[in-house]
């Protein structure tokens, strides 16, 4: 079989202007980037206001493993098959961060014959949205440092006299706004800034990866440019010496940050291998932020297509949960059905059983033990009131005996249906049965529900999410978290939803607890207000906001060939 890159290069692409017109966009609503990409102007939202919406399908997965479950492959494959069946369909996915592209995970365009193309353009830069987020974020960091420098240099009276601005009295130890870069670089996690006689004052800071920026979450959750401006103004960048929040609006930098992101608020239109439209927009990580593509892209797609297929990051305890309790809660966009991706490899890896057997080899004992993880994720999706279709992403090494056993086992669960998917090797033909079953699932009456109401106490939200969302026995708040809980409630933020920042490698907070852990207590060490994004992040366990590169990073395989073409992506 050809490599992902070879398949992408041999694809026969429609001119993006033609594809956009067929999708329902007007010429003036597309800002073309060559023949393969186009920004979609938000004036289309005004034109389509009041249009009936299509069916929204959310793709999720079992607990992720290093072997890859194929969630994006399934998202794109399902989209291609729905199109092949004669439906008007659109995929909505996140823009890949270059950190994972050059790290371990690789690209995020799908794979095989279920790809968004050209895949190298999607995985590297696209139309520059992540760079815009980085620049806007770092302007905020520079504005804080500059304001602190001038206030301390001049003192309150002279600063206000010379600048005409209010004295903010920023506490150097209260600056919470790091800088960002779109790479994995562990040595930047903790740094000293402001060193040198005329560069201070010095204070401890650090870098996060751009996908972890609250600006990225804001981009993904905003309804339009005006909403994004309001949200950016609410960003808490620092604390003053009285412990009060200093916002981007108070610092006077929110307008400029928004201006940098004025084009980033527009989704990018590309296409799948069989010419289905795909909107790529925003890229928040699911272990740190809410892990879903943008509300704007979904809103546009739902008014132009019969079916919209999107995905949440990692397993159903991560991106799917946050899709429901954060994205759907804020946007009002309600899914009609869910697709839960699994593989034989994933279930064996999630079995918790030690084995010398190669993960590709038949191992009925590990498969049966790992099935509990799949069943847990099925029940997790069902508790949100959605019909869930299990998609078994087939690998070449899979045996018919194990696949048949798994299909039969799923029939005894709460899943609406179960189908094999061979979209990776067969493209649109490989997910036809899956598409037909998903269509039937979307015809079921909607019973979508959230896990907790807005008016629930903040501590009760944390407990509910731990117990119902992860199967924990309860939570344990650190002394710091208890104090922050009281402060957030007193300041009137208890109505916000909770975003758990935890490992994706286990349903629990501990990556070593495989399968379906029980009886564990979730340790909440810190609560962080994300006033602009509109949620409170609970830091659980040891979650890094700046990844590091591994021993053999992905960049080792990436180069340019003699024809000037990029090689090694995928």
Curated annotation (Swiss-Prot):
It holds the Pfam family FTHFS. Its EC number is 6.3.4.3. It catalyses: (6S)-5,6,7,8-tetrahydrofolate + formate + ATP = (6R)-10-formyltetrahydrofolate + ADP + phosphate. The keyword Nucleotide-binding applies. One of its GO terms (molecular function) is ATP binding. One of its GO terms (biological process) is tetrahydrofolate interconversion. CDD domains: FTHFS. Keywords: ATP-binding, Ligase, Nucleotide-binding, One-carbon metabolism. ATP binds at residues 65-72. It is an enzyme of class 6 (ligase). Pathway: One-carbon metabolism; tetrahydrofolate interconversion. Belongs to the formate--tetrahydrofolate ligase family. NCBIfam families: PRK13505.1, PRK13506.1. This is Formate--tetrahydrofolate ligase. It comes from Shewanella oneidensis (strain ATCC 700550 / JCM 31522 / CIP 106686 / LMG 19005 / NCIMB 14063 / MR-1).
